[in-house]
UniProtKB/Swiss-Prot annotation:
It comes from Oryza sativa subsp. japonica (Rice). One of its GO terms (biological process) is regulation of developmental process. This is WUSCHEL-related homeobox 13. Belongs to the WUS homeobox family. It comes from the Eukaryota. One of its GO terms (molecular function) is DNA-binding transcription factor activity. PANTHER family: WUSCHEL-RELATED HOMEOBOX 9 (PTHR47288:SF1). Residues 243-270 have a biased composition (Low complexity).
């Protein structure tokens, strides 16, 4: 049977309400309740100072002795070994941040209400560090000369079996790997392509398949001149004067001959006998035309002789 004047035990695992000693109203009741909680549950944590702590006014029945939150961000408390509950020997209480899902590392509040985590030398266990990037390796001038000579010789994409041989030549002047040789040729090929696209007059690069991408203007002109066949135009001769042929046929017979020749040309399928007959008729007609002139000329000659 419970004694008079002792408050009944709490019905839940935690008790809400102000648990501070500086309360102006109901301070005796709070002190009596704390004393009763300490007697009934010797392993209990009583958190107070809600305005300063930021965790809230609550008493957690965690199976440990009464303690207050420390002023630091994190603190470690020892638990008595006589505790009836099976709990770990060490408990870490973190005030900032109060969320149990965040990693145990020191954080800093940001202006926007966020929470940024930063690594701490005290909480470096289990964290993964990003390795620092390797410094870029610059080839030596002797190695660049060897690579340029190989590239200009026509080997733009060296095969796999050639890359180790090139690396052995370059290792005489410094340490180099097969990957460095491969990437140098890739970068050199892209630089030559960009130079050709921008209209540069440098050395012509080679394409992916080993074909010549372009040629300089002078070389292309010489190549076209050598391939094109030599053509020499014929000499221009002065025009020769046309000598007129003397026509012995009388002008009266000319139309007849022209008509006969045109008729012969138009009738290509006429027989040779018809052509001969036409020529004989033209000659007879010409003689008939000339005969009156001869007759009139004879009396005149006779009159002169008389």
């Amino acid at each position: 049977m419970m004694a008079l004047g002792v408050p009944p035990p709490p019905s839940r695992a935690y008790v809400s309400g102000p648990l501070r000693d500086d309360d102006t109203f109901g301070g005796d009741r709070v002190r009596r309740r704390r004393r009763w909680l300490k007697e009934q549950c010797p392993a209990i944590i009583v958190h107070g100072g809600g305005r300063r702590g930021g965790v809230g006014h609550r008493a957690l029945a965690a199976g440990v002795s009464k303690m207050r939150l420390p002023a630091l961000n994190a603190a470690t408390h020892r638990i008595p070994s006589t505790s009836p509950l099976s709990i770990p020997q060490t408990l870490t209480i973190t005030r900032d941040p109060p969320y149990p899902m965040l990693p145990r590392s020191h954080g800093h509040r940001t202006g926007g209400g966020g929470f940024s985590l930063k690594s701490s030398p005290f909480s470096s266990v289990g964290e993964e560090r990003v390795p620092d990037p390797k410094p870029r390796r610059n080839p030596r001038p002797e190695q660049i000369r060897i690579l340029e000579a190989i590239f200009n010789s026509g080997m733009v994409n060296p095969p796999r079996d050639e890359i180790p041989r090139i690396r052995m030549q370059l290792q005489e002047y410094g340490q180099v790997g097969d990957a460095n040789v491969f990437y140098w040729f890739q970068n050199r090929k892209s630089r030559s392509k960009n130079k050709l696209r921008s209209g540069g007059t440098g050395r012509a690069g080679l394409g992916l398949g080993g074909n010549r991408a372009s040629e300089p203007p002078a070389a292309a002109t010489a190549h076209r001149e050598a391939v094109a066949p030599s053509f020499t135009p014929p000499p221009i001769l002065p025009p020769q004067p046309v000598q007129p042929q003397q026509q012995l046929v009388s002008p009266v017979a000319a139309p007849t001959s022209l008509s006969s020749s045109s008729s012969d040309r138009s009738s290509g399928s006429s027989k040779p006998a018809r052509a001969t007959l036409t020529q004989a008729m033209s000659v007879t007609a010409a003689m008939d035309l000339l005969s009156p002139l001869r007759r009139s000329a004879r009396p005149r000659q006779e009159q002169r002789h008389v």
